[in-house]
């Protein structure tokens, strides 16, 4: 049975809504949800660059051939296979902040100096911007403002969609030509990994957007282009709860095992397959995500966080990109 409504508030009752001295109830913690995971940047070893245009040499061997020489042969000098000279351009990535000196000393939620807190946030943002730069198929430019080539520009291995699709040359000088979008298949991944393996690489990391990662999990069902040799079955006892496996985090190919890393900053419609032994991040000295305090222009504090450098694929044929995906 419903309870009857109480009577109206008596006249003259002092209510909270009319009170003058009520304090705010503002939590003393500032919560942050925006992510800062950067799988490709984190996977790179760091080897300093010394010039804005950083260059490196890649040596390949002559192809294997039938080699049977006569006894007592006279030496004939064979052609030398010269190393290939590659380069990339150091890009400046910066985030700045200005805070009044008054704001630095008043009592703020979180109990921190607001200038220092903002610098920490700018550092996270620079790292995210760097992840976007190294995973994007944007081509380097030496004119100011300089821009690095992303790893996809160095990947001649992999595949493009049909139609006008053309892979990058593989030296960072172009991004290729887009083709018709198509659905991802395991056959595409297997082919790209085999191309890298044939050239001497061993991809161990797959970088992809969240949409591609979610679609990858559906490929374990088999079907055209998605041959499934074996499926893992998780055994449970009566004391354990049954777990439905709806994710694919590792893909084992005939040429190695790939850790699948969803990347919030990786461009859509592509998968980058990375041989982590052959990829470097090359910052200029004292320019590797550093904090800077700028000169005061008044009653305020100004500063920023700066990275200057580029990605350096030391053996481009060890990597691959699958472009033009529907996902």
What are the functions of these language-model segments?
Residues 2-250, 254-327:
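Flexible, glycine/threonine- and acidic-rich loop/arm segments that mediate assembly and lattice contacts
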């Amino acid at each position: 049975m419903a309870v009857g409504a109480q009577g109206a508030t008596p006249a003259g009752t002092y209510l909270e809504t009319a009170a003058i001295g009520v304090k705010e109830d503002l939590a003393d913690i500032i919560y942050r949800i925006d992510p800062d995971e950067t799988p490709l940047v984190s996977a790179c070893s760091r080897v300093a660059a010394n010039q804005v245009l950083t260059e490196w040499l890649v040596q390949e061997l002559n192809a294997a051939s039938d080699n049977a020489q006569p006894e007592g042969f006279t030496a004939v000098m064979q052609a030398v296979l010269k190393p290939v000279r590659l380069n990339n351009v150091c890009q400046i990535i910066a985030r700045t902040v200005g805070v009044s000196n008054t704001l630095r000393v008043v009592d703020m939620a979180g109990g921190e100096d607001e200038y220092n807190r903002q610098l920490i946030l700018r550092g996270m943002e620079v790292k995210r911007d760097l992840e976007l730069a190294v995973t994007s198929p944007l081509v380097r430019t030496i004119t100011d403002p300089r821009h690095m080539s992303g790893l996809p520009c160095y990947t001649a291995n992999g595949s493009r969609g049909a139609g006008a699709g053309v892979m990058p040359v593989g030296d960072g000088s172009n991004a290729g030509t887009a083709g018709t979008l198509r659905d991802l298949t395991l056959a595409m991944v297997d082919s790209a990994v085999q191309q890298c393996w044939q050239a001497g690489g061993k991809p161990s990391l797959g970088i992809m957007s969240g949409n591609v990662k979610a679609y990858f999990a559906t490929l374990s069902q088999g079907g055209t282009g998605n041959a499934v040799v074996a499926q893992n079955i998780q055994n449970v006892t009566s004391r354990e709860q049954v777990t439905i496996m709806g994710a694919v985090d590792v893909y084992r190919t005939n040429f190695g095992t790939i850790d699948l890393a969803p990347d919030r900053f990786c461009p859509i419609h592509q998968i980058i397959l990375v041989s982590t032994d052959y990829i470097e991040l090359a910052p200029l000295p004292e320019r590797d995500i550093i904090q800077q305090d700028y000169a005061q222009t008044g009653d305020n504090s100004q500063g920023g966080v700066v990275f200057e450098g580029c990605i350096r694929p030391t053996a481009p044929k060890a990597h691959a990109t699958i472009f033009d995906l529907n996902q």
